[in-house]
Amino acid sequence: GFSDYKINLGGALICGYTGVGPDAIVNRSAVKSSVRGEEVALDVLAAAQPKKLYILLGTNTLTTVGAADRFLAYYGQMLDVLRQTLGEDCVIYVESIPPVRPEAAAEKPGLASDIIRSVNEQLALLAADKGCVYLDLWETLADGEGNLKEVLAAPDGVHFSAGNGYGAWVTYLRNHAKYSADNSWTMGSIYSAQ
C-alpha cells in the first residue's frame, strides 16, 4: 500500500506484505515485499531497531469464520517476540483491524462487522497486557453501520483506496502518535513543530 502508492511517511521503514498474519512473524517465515523482495520480516525489524512500530495485519487472516482464536493466539506471541527483539524502548502501536464493505463481508464471512469488532476488543486487551498502544481505526474508517466508508474503499471492498483511504489512515496515525521531539513520523500531525 504505502510503498505502492508513493505515500510520504517521513522516511519510515515500511514492511508491507500481502496476506501476512502474525504467524508469519512468529515462525520467521519468508514473506515478499514489493520494494525489497523476499525477506524475513522479523530480521528486517531487528536490523532497523525502530523506536516506534505500527502494526496493521489480520484482515486477510480472518476471511474464514473460526480463524479468530488462532489469529489472536499468534498475535499475542508476535507481540512478545517483537518486544524481545526490539526492546522495551520501542513503542509498539497495535492498530485495530479495519472494517470492510458489506459486499466484501458477504463473500468472506469471517470479516463480518461483529466478528471484526470482537477481535478488535481482544486486540485492545492484548495491547494493554503487553504494554503496547492500541489505535482504534474504526472512528475514522467506519460509517454509521460499522462498514468501511465507501469513499475510502478500494474496489475489492477490503483494502483502502489509493487516495482517500490511505490518506485517512495516515492522517489518523499522525494525529494519534505519542508525541516525541525526535519522531519525524509525526510530521504534519497537530503536534509537529513545522
Task: Provide a role label for each language-model segment.
Residues 1-73:
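Conserved SGNH/GDSL esterase-like catalytic core that processes O-acyl groups on lipids
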Residues 1-8, 75-76, 90-92, 116, ...:
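Short intrinsically disordered, low-complexity coil segments enriched in acidic
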Residues 42, 79, 120-124:
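Short amphipathic alpha-helical segments and helix-helix/interface helices
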Residues 43-44, 77, 81-85, 172:
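A generic secondary-structure signal
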Residues 46-49, 85-87, 128-129:
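Extracellular/periplasmic catalytic domains that process cell-envelope and extracellular macromolecules
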Residues 54-62, 81-118, 138-139:
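Active-site segments of SGNH/GDSL-like serine hydrolases
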Residues 68-78, 116-119:
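Charged helix-capping and loop-helix junction motifs
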Residues 99-194:
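Catalytic His-Asp segment of secreted/periplasmic serine-dependent ester chemistry enzymes
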